[in-house]
Amino acid sequence: MEGKAAVTTSTEHGDGEASRTAARTVVSGSSRGGAASRALSVADLILRVVAVVAIVDSAIAMGTTNQTLPFFTQFLRFKAQYSDLPTLTLFVVANSAVTAYLVLSIPLSVVHIIRSRASYSRLVLIFLDSVMLALVAAVASASAAIVYLAHKGNVRANWFAVCQQFDSFCERISGPLIGSFAAMAVLLLLVLLSAAALARR
């Protein structure tokens, strides 16, 4: 009887140790998962700030682009500005809209740092980030085509390269495209980060 009691006690002790070990393993795994999700959320916040800077610079640079050329007399001048081209106007409007969205999404990104296991809000961000990525890609690509025509023209369509006269204007409208394409890359990274954070849950 005493032997059976000893065996029973030993078995119960072993079961208790196994349960505690399993519990510690679960807690440890949960802690590591939470730390990884929090790190992804911090990276998300930093990338959103970077995207805001890139988009704002692009919109401001494009929106303030103009050049005036004197023609024969000081009273007759040729002027070129971004609003003369509807595609570049759309570029400024779209970049402004994306900037507003990114600024509004920053508080939600901060919430994800505090509550790393939030999932519904991450799904919303993935959807909206994807929409903004598509918008930026569309306007940046269309604007790049217009800038190319401004530099090279199209002989078959009788479109002349205006950059031969408005060289400063063309330099100014080329620069914002770099920031816009950089913002595209950042938005793509944001979508991937949110997807990775959801996959770790």
UniProtKB/Swiss-Prot annotation:
Tagged with keyword Cytoplasm: no
Transmembrane segments: 42-62, 88-108, 123-143, 173-193
Domain of life: Eukaryota
Keywords, alphabetical: Cell membrane, Cell wall biogenesis/degradation, Glycoprotein, Membrane, Transmembrane, Transmembrane helix
Major localization class: membrane
Compartments where located: Cell membrane
Glycosylation sites: N66
Annotated stretches, region: Disordered: 1-23
Keyword Glycoprotein: yes
Gene Ontology CC annotation, any one: plasma membrane
Membrane topology: Multi-pass membrane protein
Entries under Pfam families matching the protein: CASP_dom
Extracellular side, ranges: 63-87, 144-172
Swiss-Prot/TrEMBL GO biological process terms: cell wall organization
InterPro entries according to UniProt: CASP/CASPL, CASP_dom, CASPL
Residue ranges that the UniProt entry lists as topological domain Cytoplasmic: 1-41, 109-122, 194-201
Chain's role: Regulates membrane-cell wall junctions and localized cell wall deposition. Required for establishment of the Casparian strip membrane domain (CSD) and the subsequent formation of Casparian strips, a cell wall modification of the root endodermis that determines an apoplastic barrier between the intraorganismal apoplasm and the extraorganismal apoplasm and prevents lateral diffusion.
PANTHER family referenced in this protein's UniProt entry, alphabetically: CASP-LIKE PROTEIN, CASP-LIKE PROTEIN 1U1
Subunit organization: Homodimer and heterodimers.
Family: Belongs to the Casparian strip membrane proteins (CASP) family.
Name the UniProt record assigns to this protein: Casparian strip membrane protein 4
Organism phylogeny: Eukaryota, Viridiplantae, Streptophyta, Embryophyta, Tracheophyta
